[in-house]
Amino acid sequence: AFSGILAEADIAAALKACEAAGTFNYKAFFAKVGLTGKSADDIKKAFFVIDQDKSGFIEEDELKLFLQVFSAGARALTDDETKAFLKAGDSDGDGAIGVEEWAALVKA
C-alpha cells in the first residue's frame, strides 16, 4: 500500500517499536517509518492510503486500525491511543482528520 513512499524495513521497525498496547506515539511512529522527512506530496499519498473509506477524512475507526494499514498482522490501537491520536490531529474539532490536518500532524 505504501510502496514507493515508505521502505518495508522502516515499516517493520516502526511497528515493532509500538507492538505493546499503550506504547503507540504518533510522532515516534512517523519518524521511524520515515514519513516525517517525506515531501508534502508523499505525505498526502499516505493520507489517502489510510483513508480507507475514501471519505476525504481519517475518522476515529480508521485511526484505531491505523497500524493495520501498514501491516495486516499489526494490532489495533487502544481506545486511549486512538483518542490521543485524533485529538492531536483534529485541529478544527470536527471529529476527523482532514488532509491538511494530517500534513500538519506529520510535520509537527
Curated annotation (Swiss-Prot):
The keyword Cell membrane does not apply. It holds the Pfam family EF-hand_7. GO terms for molecular function: calcium ion binding. Signal peptide: none annotated. Ca(2+) 2 binds at D90, D92, D94, A96, E101. GO terms for cellular component: cytoplasm. Ca(2+) 1 binds at D51, D53, S55, F57, E59, E62. Residues 38-73, 77-108 form the EF-hand domain. The keyword Protein biosynthesis does not apply. Keywords: Acetylation, Allergen, Calcium, Metal-binding, Muscle protein, Repeat. It comes from the Eukaryota. The modification N-acetylalanine is found at A1. In muscle, parvalbumin is thought to be involved in relaxation after contraction. It binds two calcium ions. Belongs to the parvalbumin family. Is regarded as an important allergen. This is Parvalbumin beta 2.
